Amino acid sequence: MTDATAARRNIVILTIAQALGASSPPIVISLGGLVGQKLSSDPALVTLPVSLFNLGLALGTLPAAFFMRQFGRRNAYMLGALVGAAAGVIAAAGIFAASFLIFCLGTLTAGFYASYVQSYRFAATDAATGDMKARAISWVMVGGLVAAIVGPQLVIWTRDTIPDAMFAGSFLSQAVLGLLALPVLFMLRAPKVRKDPNAIHDTGRPLGEILRSPRFILSVAAGVCSYALMTFVMTAAPIAMVGHGHSVDHAALGIQWHVLAMFAPSFFTGKLITRFGKEKITALGLVLIAFSAIIALGGFDVGHFWGALIFLGIGWNFGFIGATAMVTDCHTPAERGKAQGANDFIMFGTVACASFFAGSLLHSSGWETINWLVFPIVALVLVPLILRLKPKGAAAEA
């Protein structure tokens, strides 16, 4: 089997694994706040389960990178899938016991699983070179398109399957998804890496030096902005929808449209990046996120919520995939593990904070305030991105 064939095989496997693994977050996001409302006596804590999911994602990135480095991606990913199965069982147990604490432990554990799933996009680039990196990332993210349908539909199909424990069935289905991922991940094979004999002991630059690189800082900032703003608005959306008189099914379908929009562009995002460049597509993503806030501020009908969530998802896709591709240009193969791990730790740590503050801010200030905050944060990253593009344009004209 040639390296190219092995790489394509791994992309297919990772895409299927992504479809299964990425079906879990929509369940947590759709129901985390609603279950929080039932189990928590403090309205400010209703989004804590979703925040802990994102915190688990952030805290899990560095251990996941360590396990991948020590035991290989396949073994680490299978461990992650087992953790995902356990997470669903724990969350369901919390609902059965009417325990907010146990339920939160389940969503935190689900975040640990998500930290492995998030790195599938980097695993796809292990044997890719040049422009193929962006396409490899993009194709693995296509698995999320299936997840966009499976996750929310599981919520609708299973939310009342156990009458005395509303939503417990949905989290048990989450456990099944983790178990189904195990045989898929078992087929993953690490690509052969041709090592430079002169670089056997090369560990690359110290992490501190990488973190101080302006290029790395901008790449991480773009990813953080795209993901944190998406999570900030998305976490508040289901609660805001129900609060404005819409049904739980409407809220779940809103998340489904949102997640579909997050992953559907992946069919062509890689090609767009190849044609127009990483920075331009990332900037376009940020503009679309700002546009989603404009739609959200237009009213409280189902159409306003769904329209905002759809453009928020498309903006996330361009911003996140573009920023991920930017990060892969900021490190050598020897620096890959620590650079990618640091990127995800910073990004998902910020995402955890964003999801937590979404709940308290929604309770204290309302849905409009959530969306007004999008504009200054987008501007903070969009301006440096545009300034980075200007010299290239000037050089091209000269």
Curated annotation (Swiss-Prot):
Its membrane topology is listed as: Multi-pass membrane protein
Keyword Cytoplasm found: no
By sequence similarity, the record places it as follows: Belongs to the major facilitator superfamily.
Species lineage: Bacteria, Pseudomonadati, Pseudomonadota, Alphaproteobacteria, Hyphomicrobiales
The protein, known as:
Riboflavin transporter RfnT
Where would you find this protein in the cell? Answer: Cell membrane
Listed GO cellular component terms?
A: plasma membrane
For the keyword Transmembrane helix, the answer is yes
Coiled-coil boundaries: none
Q: What does this protein do?
A: Transports riboflavin into the cell.
Keywords from the UniProt entry: Cell membrane, Membrane, Transmembrane, Transmembrane helix, Transport
Please state the protein's primary subcellular location: membrane
Where do the TM regions start and end? Answer: 13-35, 45-67, 74-91, 95-117, 137-156, 166-188, 220-242, 252-274, 281-300, 305-324, 345-367, 372-389
